[in-house]
Amino acid sequence: MSLDINQIALHQLIKRDEQNLELVLRDSLLEPTETVVEMVAELHRVYSAKNKAYGLFSEESELAQTLRLQRQGEEDFLAFSRAATGRLRDELAKYPFADGGFVLFCHYRYLAVEYLLVAVLSNLSSMRVNENLDINPTHYLDINHADIVARIDLTEWETNPESTRYLTFLKGRVGRKVADFFMDFLGASEGLNTKAQNRGLLQAVDDFTAEAQLDKAERQNVRQQVYSYCNEQLQAGEEIELESLSKELAGVSEVSFTEFAAEKGYELEESFPADRSTLRQLTKFAGSGGGLTINFDAMLLGERIFWEPATDTLTIKGTPPNLRDQLQRRTSGGN
């Protein structure tokens, strides 16, 4: 992995009681040893693989102001990280669920892009076997389940300050929503809405095939084509490129997909991240509620599965063998 650490700082927040978080600050930066580089590379890998929300700094963001000064050489990285950790402690102290942890600030370069990654990591206990085959306790950083993480694309921020996507963050677990405190600490608000972009794409594709007067099978083939392209981009860690997608759909209509989307005003970005759950709707219908869960391929609608909107009734012709077997055993047993 072509990852180069520029500067990295680590501090700690310790929860002593319900009201107090103790601040433990390092007096020096971490040395980018092989172990440190491996840790950052793993954190980068794990973070990059997760679904993220996008944001941008507000004009009043204290973190953005001090980061800009640090980038201009008016403040060193250690001082910047120490002051920022203090502000994070003040934000966390407002919430009873605050657990503390290790606060990491890492300025690194990956594939010619500079990043600042900010994360709160937990220390977990486990067991290890030593050279004498004895079992001893050990501790490790829980990188795989880190959910208080944000990353600033410094290159994008400094070259395109009007961007709505230079800051990414994880939304966190239920009850520990990053928006409740981490976004306040960052002085940021949500920017590019990835789900909205993907929903807009799905609507544009449906309208595009309808205007082209395709039959049902042709429409589903186009949806499958779009899904295949988007899924390939997702698996490769790349964004959906409208121009590339439009080329994939050449021949569907006399008008290109990009021209159609622009003319109809779907407000799609030239490129945006793929959202797996939204894109799945191109090829499947799924829903749950009231003790019922249904999931089926879109091509079955109108063939083996029929929906009557007036009565909100779904009729299934030909049930799966394992389901049919369960139904037969239950009904024959009189239960």
UniProtKB/Swiss-Prot annotation:
One of the Pfam families matching this protein, by short name: NA37
Key words, A-Z: Cytoplasm
Protein name: Nucleoid-associated protein YejK
GO cellular component, one term: bacterial nucleoid
HAMAP family: NdpA (MF_00730)
Gene: yejK
Entry's family note: Belongs to the YejK family.
Gene Ontology MF annotations: double-stranded DNA binding; single-stranded RNA binding
Keyword Oxidoreductase: no
InterPro entries (UniProt xref): Nucleoid_associated_NdpA
Subcellular location as annotated: Cytoplasm, Nucleoid
Major localisation: cytoplasm
